[in-house]
Amino acid sequence: VWRYRPSAHEARNGEAMSPGKLELFVEPNDSDVVENCDNLTVSPWGDLVLCEDGPEQQHLVGVTPDGALYKLGRNALNSSEFAGVVFSPDGQELYVNIQNPGITLAIKGPWELGG
């Protein structure tokens, strides 16, 4: 997961002298921790939520602002990937798609504890 830190002068004069920075935020090289994530969203509590797209069991994986990873959910239906994740505007429901059979789940919190 890459993180972009904008310049204090983003899109204004002075940006070239003090540009934003793209940095590697988290790179877990252990497929037991997270595998082939290709969708993400920001949770109401500030963590990232990643969707796995691996060859076996699929998870929703949380990433805290300091880079710690945790399992948030698991596809117990089949081994199809999660494809897209987002929270409702009020932050009470998480919506996530399972690619096959092409369904969307609405999952209610409570989410206040985060990871």
Predicted region positions:
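Sequence/structural signature of beta-propeller domains
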Residues: 1-115
